[in-house]
């Protein structure tokens, strides 16, 4: 069927990642594609996604040796990726022998050759930041190597709504190149403005459909034909309150009062700040407040030393992320 495009728009937690991996698996099974690159906006989200792609590859490609790499500037500090780099290539078994103890999982490695400068995208499977792919459409040295690494693969681009106007322009050029290189592409977004959605379709060479239908939606382009399908919504309710501080009282003080009441009998809460300095100030405030003495406080921002940041990130995933295999057994 040639290169295909899918745009999945749905709220957080609706399974967009699983749907993208399912599509990738179908396209890889067709024999038209040679690998997978999963691109995300940040290093933290890339590290978390590596574990999910690793679990998929281990279950799906049993008995095979596959290269899986993490591509961003601090990948060497990721524990999961470090473990992959220490694995050697196993001795191949005779082709006509299949023992009772034959492996049921893929043997994933991160060969040193692909860890060279600008070579990461040549790995058959990789997870990383979006800039690794965007360098392929910029006038940078050896940009053709990045395009060569992407050619013929399934490429998943996450959080496409999160980029500014400049990066969105680069993203459209990337989508245009990916189609020319024989890639099939999945775009994931929570909410995608119509103008941005139409721009991405034009970059793929597709026409804008007559109507977009209801949200959440799945938009596919196969052989130049655009199809829009509504995804059945799940009944989910949220309670959103706007906190108004009394006259003369700082907003942070009012928010602390609200949290103290909510957490009096236990529970979890996240206080999300727009700057590192503000997050540090809130953290010190809660530390000094006796009403939070029974709470475990965790400060998480991008200015920690790399090793410490990785530890905190792992702790955040452990506390607030999905359960691991060990926890569900």
PLM regions and their residue ranges:
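N-terminal helicase ATP-binding lobe
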Residues: 1-329
